[in-house]
Amino acid sequence: NLYRRYGKNYLDRAAEMTIKRMDKWGLNTLANRSDKTIYDKNRKAFILPLENIGFENELMGLMDVYDNGIEKKMDEAIARNVAKYKNNHWLIGYFIGNEPAWISKENRLCSLILNGKDRPIKTELQNFLKESGDTPDTRKTFIYKTFEKLMKAISKSLKKNDPNHLNLGIRYGYIEQLDDELLRISKESFDALSFNCYALSPDHEKMNHALEISGLPMIIGE
């Protein structure tokens, strides 16, 4: 349809039309995962997602941070992500992930790891449970410890490869999921607390509590 409307240069002309509409509607920021043809016009502020940096479906959105080679691979992937935009003044920052699937399912994730292939995170978990006991609470503690280690590694890499822009967090699925420990980890790792909201409005009481614990500005991703 765009080709039929605009002809061969339809991408550029459609991008121009989008910017005109945003101006008319009073919108000043492009949404996450908008078309890069529009980003590259450099006429509206925008946000980028970090892509393909190593999150694993097998680990419900974590990485095996106990693998000696994983941080190097992740760092190289982040460097590739930010190379084009690290000096772009229109970029606000990066979402480093989206809706971690393991939150509130830490026990299940530990079972997946223990029943899965031999790998460093499995060995680390086995040793941790042997020392601390195998309970739902100790399993949750291990996953939180792993998540914190991963978030700090990503934050360090992002600041090294692009010190000019913000780490906008991991777009938690629901602010209601976030206990005080996750808020503390977020405070130590992110420049903003991002979450998605599928209700008509977010829970203001939960937002106030999140602000009290994390001290971070908040952004609703979707």
Regions found by a protein language model. Name each.
Residues S34, L48-L50, I96-N98, G169-Y172, ...:
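A cross-domain feature marking catalytic cores of carbohydrate-active enzymes
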Residues D40-G54, H89, I96-S132:
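Aromatic- and acidic-residue-enriched segments that line the glycan-binding/catalytic groove
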Residues N1, I121-K130, T146-L150, S155:
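Short, compositionally biased "basic patch" segments
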Residues D23-T29, N42-I47, N87-G93, D162-N167, ...:
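Loop/turn elements at helix/coil->beta-strand transitions in domains of secreted/extracellular proteins
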Residues L48-P49, D64-V65, R184-K187:
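Short, hinge-like loop/turn segments at secondary-structure boundaries
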Residues T37-Y39, F55, P100-S104, Y174-L178, ...:
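Flexible loop/turn segments at secondary-structure boundaries
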Residues N1-D40, E56-W90, G133-K145, G221:
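Active-site-adjacent substrate/metal-binding segments within catalytic domains
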Residues T141, K145-K156, K160-E222:
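Glycoside hydrolase catalytic-domain groove-lining segments
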